[in-house]
Amino acid sequence: TIAVTAEPGTGRDPWPKDKKMHAEWQLGLSVMNREGEFSPTLYHPVLGEKNSLMNVGDSLSFSFRYTIQKADWYAVLKHTINDIYRFTDFLRLKQTKYSLTQRLYDMHAYLTNDSTSKWHNLVYKGVTIGAQDYLGGVYDSEKDAMKNSDYGAMWMLAKLTDDPRLTQKRLPNALNFKLMQQHAEEDFLCGSSAGQYYLYKSKRFTEEWGPYTEPIATTYYMLMDMGNILLFEPQQKELKQHVKLAADRLLEWMKPNGQWEVAYENKTLKPTFTDITDLRPTFYGLLIAYEILKDKKYLQAAIQGADWYVENAVKKGHFLGVCGDTRFVPDFATAQSAQALLELYNVTKNEKYKEAAISTAKIYTASVYTHPIPTSVVKQVKGIERKDWEISQVGLSFEHGGVAGSANHRGPILLASHAGMFVRMYRLTKDSLFLNMARAAAIGRDAFVDFKTGVASYYWDSMNNGAGPYPHHAWWQVGWITDYLLSEISLRSNGGITYPGGFITPKVGPHLTYGFTSGMVFGTKADLIMRPGLFKLDNPYIEYMAALNEKEKTVFLILLNNDDEKQTSLIEMDTKCLFSGKKIRVKNVASLNNQGHSTLVDGVENWNVTIDAYGLTVLKIKYK
């Protein structure tokens, strides 16, 4: 492999002083030189851009280096990221005042407030459906669009908190929304998704960017969402029939070679977007159908679809996105493909799917910003002093790229759905770039979080504006943060603490849902729980998850140090928060290290815990 890399500092600084300069174009890259030969080429300055107007006799120079290595492209990319652009140094700069765990609890409060989360219940065809306002652009909308995002996270948060505002008021109407979202007429579209959005003024479902139906939308809004609900409510026989309808529709649409069309026009039912190919993980819906319905025909079809996908997408490095407003330029669906292939490997044990998953994850690292090098230079953001690293784009992935993608004018996104998947990839490969990228995306992003709600902005250039027109994004944030933390817990405990993951969430990336069944904490079964007020920590670098074995009267407090230095925290427990209307008393507490070895701890109300850099400790709390 041969590469050419500009010296750090040649490209633009997206926020050099006190305003966004993200679109300033100072460096051009090409795989073709001026003679039309295949050769990595840099251009600086870019014609028509800054410093490109020069007089006779003027000179300008810039520094670059060639890299030649007897290895593939990925090895050279890693060298550039780690050795030239010093990616790993970023984690040493990071600081935080707001833990990811606290964000989960604050978003729980935000999401259960109908006013702040913009939740509405409406009657559609005699059925009460519930969803959140969506104030972005939607085809034919009159600012009346409604949407639900992460059904897995909705059911997960309801299960973990046992909050009646969710279990009794939200979930039944969200389920109705999902059932009514399925195209019911017995025709060419039967079983498919009628559209992501509900328009309450015209009382109909619609797609974001036009009157068409995509097969992958059936994978997303039917099979992923319904599959995740059924993990929590397997007794829902009617819902299984809806899953079968959706899966059979995908089967009908699949071509003999395992391929799908990108979309069909709703009126003519003819294929549309015929100039592009469905290089997306549409096959994953059939894998879900197999796992839910246990019918081998769905697994065989999923394998056929995946085989086509591996040959035509993964091996060629060609991918399509899922955002119609940018005509499907590559986006976070690439990361979903990695997780989908990994799950197919887990079911079939066919090594080619594991290798394809790893290959796809490697390709997705190129969707993560790794420049410019973060520093401690002080900058101004909306009148507030911020160090450069606080607002750095490094470690964040884009929503979509290409000439039409939001990466060009908005920068990357804070919705780090890929973080948990990258931790899993590190466990598989021991490739530290995956782990460092996961942590760079997740940790120390305070400058982008609305501290009143715990919700991070979606786009980088929104800084800490919060949810804005996208209140449903909080569900995705609950989902990806939980997936990331549980993936770190599994990694740091060497598999001693594991919780089964559910299915991928639609659209924004590969994060999984949890909590539908018990996990294991060093040999003991325990259910994940969230109880506001149960634990109080005084160190925001320490993240935690809690788990309960009610039969053995044991609470596990699983603690993570998410810093590159040793950290200490005082932990207080308010026992009355564990069970509503039921008093308990702590008998004894033991501290378990990352191997599960136990040491008794003094105290029954509060404890001081010290955890090594990126380490794990578990408090095993016995009560009566």
Where are these regions (language model features)?
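Carbohydrate-recognition beta-sandwich/jelly-roll modules
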Residues: 1-241, 245-248, 553-555, 567-624
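Solvent-exposed loop and edge beta-strand segments that line ligand/cofactor-binding
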Residues: 47-49, 130-148, 201-223, 262-281, ...
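Catalytic cores of secreted or luminal carbohydrate-active enzymes
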Residues: 475-536
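Extended amphipathic alpha-helical coiled-coil/heptad-repeat regions
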Residues: 177-304, 310, 314-321, 330-333, ...
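CBM-like carbohydrate-recognition segments
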Residues: 366-414, 423, 427, 433-498
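Long, well-ordered core segments of solenoidal/helical folds
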Residues: 100-135, 165-189, 237-261, 296-320, ...
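Well-ordered alpha-helical scaffold segments within catalytic/enzyme domains
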Residues: 149-164, 220-238, 280-295, 336-350, ...
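Carbohydrate-binding surface patches
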Residues: 423, 521-580
